[in-house]
Each structure stands twice: as C-alpha cells, then as structure tokens.
Amino acid sequence: MSFSVEVLAGIAIELQRGIGHQDRFQRLITTLRQVLACDASALLRYESGQFIPLAIDGLAQDVLGRRFTLEGHPRLEAIARAGDVVRFPADSDLPDPYDGLIPGQESLKVHACVGLPLFAGQNLIGALTFDAMTPAQFEVFSDEELRLIAALAAGALSNALLIEQLESQNMLPRSSAAFEPIKETHMIGLSPAMTQLKKEIEIVASSDLNVLIGGETGTGKELVAKAIHQGSPRAVNPLVYLNCAALPESVAESELFGHVKGAFTGAISNRSGKFEMADNGTLFLDEIGELSLALQAKLLRVLQYGDIQRVGDDRSLRVDVRVLAATNRDLREEVLAGRFRADLFHRLSVFPLFVPPLRERGNDVVLLAGYFCEQCRLRLGLSRVVLSPGARRHLLNYGWPGNVRELEHAIHRAVVLARATRAGDEVILEAQHFALSEDVLPAPPAESFLALPNCRNLRESTENFQRELIRQALAQNHHNWAASARALETDVANLHRLAKRLGLKD
C-alpha cells in the first residue's frame, strides 16, 4: 500500500485548518490514525529526558496528563535513540507505555506499535506513536511512507515551537488563537479555566510586576509561582520560598530580613534573610495573609524603597527582588476587617491571578490522575498503573474539597490498596479503591461541656476542652493549621504553641 497524493494533501489541509497549536495537533493525529487504520495514535513533545503528550486519539484521556520518562519506558527510549522508523513486533519483550490505556481494551496488551522520532535539524523535539491490537497492522506501510508522515508532523511541531519562542521574545504579536504555550510547566490541564490562567502567567511572567496569587488550599499556587519565575528574565537567579503561616512571630522578622550577631539570644552569627537570598531573583511568600500588621509594614517598605535592615543592624541593604505572594484568604475582606494593610494589598495586587479549584476544572481531574498514576508507577517500580472507566467516572463525580493535593493523596492511597489485592506488578485502579465519600468525613458533632469526661480540676477540664476544639478545627479544615487558626480566631503561631503544650503535635 502507498499513500496517494490525495492522502498527503488531506493531511496538510487538516494542519492548515487548525486554529491554534492544540487544534492542529489534534487534527493531525486523528487524521493519521484514520490513514493507518490503527487503534491509537499520539503526538509527544520531547523535553528534559521525557515525552509529554500533546494530542491523542484512541487513548484514555488521562494519557494527556502522564509524563513518560525514557528510563521508565524502554520503547520510548528506543524511539528517541533510533533516529528513524521503529517497528516493535507483536512478541517484543519491551512493555508498551499504552498497555491498558486503550478504552475498551484495558485488559489486553498492544500487539503492534510503530514509533517515529521527530527532529528539527539534529535535535529531537518529539515523536509520533501508533498502536494496534492487530499484530500485522503496520506491515502494509513502508518505512519511506512513514518517514513522510514524520516529516509532516515534525514540521508542524517545529513551527509551533518556533512561534512560541518568538512570542516569548516579543518578536511576534500574541494572537488569541496562536498564543497557546506548549512548553512544560507541570501545570497540567486543558480546561478553559486553566488555559486562561496559563495565558495570564505568560503575560505577567516577562514583566517585573509583583503578583498576588489567590486560590483555595491545595490548588497549586506554588506551581503558578514557579511558572512565573521560570518564564521571567530572573529565571537564572534563585526562587526563594517562605511559608508565612509556619513563621512564629518571634523569628518572622529574622527569616525575612536576616539578623546580625548578638541581635537577640541565640543569634551567634550573622544570618541572611530570605530577601537577601532572593537578591536579583524572586521571593515567593506563601500564605501572606498570616503576616502580622507590624511585619506587613516592614514588607511594604521593602516593596516601596528596595532596602532592608537586618535585625539588630542600623545599616540598610539594597535588594532587587520580585515578590510573588499567595493566599487562600480574601484579602479585600481582610483589608476591610483591618487585618491586612490596604497599601500593601495594592502593592502586591498589581496583577492578581486566581487559581481555579479542581471542581471547576472539569476533565482536568482525569489528566491530573494520569500524572499521579505515572508518578506512583515509577516510585513503586510497577509496570503499569491504569484507571478503570469506573474509576474515572468516580473521580469526575467527586467534589474535591482538598483540590489537587487531595487528588494526589487519593491516587497514592488507591495504588497501595489495589497493589495489596492483586499479585504482580500491574495495577488497575477501580472505584472501590478510592472510597472518596469516606475520605473527607464531616467533623464529629461538638461535645457539650457537660459531656466531657469528669476531670479533677478546672485546669484539666479547660485543657481537655481546648484539645477537642483544636481537633475539630483541624478536621474541618483538612489539617491546615492556618485555616484552623482563623476558624478559632487566634494567631497561627499561638495555635502551634498551644497544640504543642496540649500534646497534639511534636
């Protein structure tokens, strides 16, 4: 069999019809799957020793969230190193990365596979993979015909990468259709909400503006900060992280600005603070809403004038730091309540970003589940970890109050449970392995004071009552100490100290 001119022209026309990179890629692999009459096709981007799916047809949706490392997938490694068409026979000993990931064929293994490495000059930029359940499916196609397909795909991918590079250098205007970043940021998701967020990140990253990142706990605000830093001119310099919610008031100023020897008891030497460490780079202040008003005033001064003072030192030090701040609070309400400075809020929120909760991201749940399944597979040394159709439906129907972090933990727990009930190194996750309705239990009803155990004295009764209140607050807030402190209307540092005194934490 040979490709007719009409077939090749049809592939080229489909590429031209696409609106934006993603649409072109999808049209390409859908058309190629039809031409080769196979069960599945995929276009992969190569970056940093791994293949990243850009478009798929005939494969489970969670494949788009997986990241295929060369060391973890011998077939993909063979494709990357071959430099030409690679055909895997039906009896190949190398496991196929898509085993169990073709819908309706979860229990069967792929019988025929062809891989086409894609090059821009001498550089590997991606690959095309085609899979079939029929062993001899690809024998009718010559290597020369498959090379033609590879050339078309390589041209499309290379052009997309070039456009992205020129846009990032502000050498091309960013049209709404073409402006679809395809580089890897580990921010997995194709939902409208995530697509919009990625566009906003690309816009603000190249500037030097301070950014306020809002969103619920567990949505991935730190990943947003990393993406902004990586896309900025400061990427060659450090990104320094500080969790404001974990800062005891007594050391918070020293952590931010540093101290000199003898500034306070225990200051046995000079120490740089996070601002000095981030000089010429970026400082990410997580949970900034937990900072005291006194520290907010000192932070404001740094943003205004660009200088800091170490604790115990009269001298000022100049720093050049971009500040990215994150919070799960509504800082506008905090300003109205007098708990957050209005001038600091306006300094930070020049370009605010909001990370959507997982429940508003639709099918991104499945993509993220695929990513975490692949992580578990590598970590536990398994040959495959796949989601059954029932498990996918189960994940989509759940509300995810703990967002992406809860999904990650749920996948890890499900893999451990499934592995314990099935021999071998292959794991298929079923709905019953998640039991999500039990993962987030409502907090038990508060015991009345009279229902507490009899205690000898007032102090013991008070401590028991405090323990119960803290336990309930932690249960209701998914063991987030900052959120629990807000619910109890106390300072988070005081809550940590009280919990230690009551034996609730080490």
Swiss-Prot record:
Membrane-spanning residues where? Answer: none
Write out the pathway annotation from the protein's UniProt entry. Nitrogen metabolism; nitric oxide reduction
Q: Which cysteines are joined by disulfide bonds?
A: none
What are the 4-aspartylphosphate sites (modified residues) in this protein? D57
Q: Name one GO molecular function term.
A: ATP binding
Q: Which domain of life is it from?
A: Bacteria
Q: Which PROSITE patterns match?
A: SIGMA54_INTERACT_1, SIGMA54_INTERACT_2, SIGMA54_INTERACT_3, SIGMA54_INTERACT_4
Keywords, A to Z, come to: ATP-binding, DNA-binding, Nucleotide-binding, Phosphoprotein, Transcription, Transcription regulation
Please list the residue ranges the record marks as binding DNA.
481-500
Q: Does Transcription count among this protein's keywords?
A: yes
Q: Which InterPro entries match?
A: AAA+_ATPase, GAF, GAF-like_dom_sf, Homeodomain-like_sf, NorR, P-loop_NTPase, Sigma_54_int, Sigma_54_int_dom_ATP-bd_1
Q: Which residues form the Sigma-54 factor interaction domain?
A: 187-416
SMART domains recorded for this chain?
A: AAA, GAF
Which residues participate in ATP binding? 215-222, 278-287
Q: Which GO terms describe its biological process?
A: phosphorelay signal transduction system
Purpose of the protein? Required for the expression of anaerobic nitric oxide (NO) reductase, acts as a transcriptional activator for at least the norVW operon. Activation also requires sigma-54.
Provide the protein name: Anaerobic nitric oxide reductase transcription regulator NorR
